Amino acid sequence: MRIVTTPMCEEVVKISGINNYIVNKNPDEEEGDFAILLSESKVDMDSIQIKLNTPCQLFESIREVSKLNNQLDEDEIIEFFTEYPLCLKYLKNHDNSHVKVKVYSNFLRDIILNMGFEICDENYDYIVFPDYLIDKLDKTDAQLVEIPSHNSVAKNPFERIEMRYSILEKLI
């Protein structure tokens, strides 16, 4: 089976023990049998679509992709998280409902819910938004919290989570 993955998913493919694969931002450009890509992406070939926004999603994605090879057990997957303290900490959802935020974008919504912040449309203290929306936000009294989007962060999902969560942890 010829596997094609995107650069953002390559680390999960490696961790899962798959060695024979092709990396292309546009998997349909390759003559592949199967693609591993982010959930918001679409391809014509058979695929697994994974989410990598939160530690929980990353864990489940590693578990799913590893089924294509020799399935990793929970302890083997957790071992990859030990070098990343925020990834390890947020493998379980938290309750930080005292932090009230308005959030823009689905990928940030996943993160905010995982961290246990309360999502509000009114009476919020912070507006959390992806960097590509900076010029589209209205003036507000709330504190703006800019989070790097996919184009502005590491391809490694652990490093990406650490960076984003470290910004948001300052709100607690």
Question: For each predicted feature, which ranges?
Answer:
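A basic- and aromatic-enriched beta-loop-alpha substructure that forms the phosphate/nucleotide-
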Residues: 36-43, 50-78
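A nucleotide-sugar donor-handling region in carbohydrate enzymes
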Residues: 77-85
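Extreme N-terminal starter segment of soluble prokaryotic enzymes
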Residues: 1-3
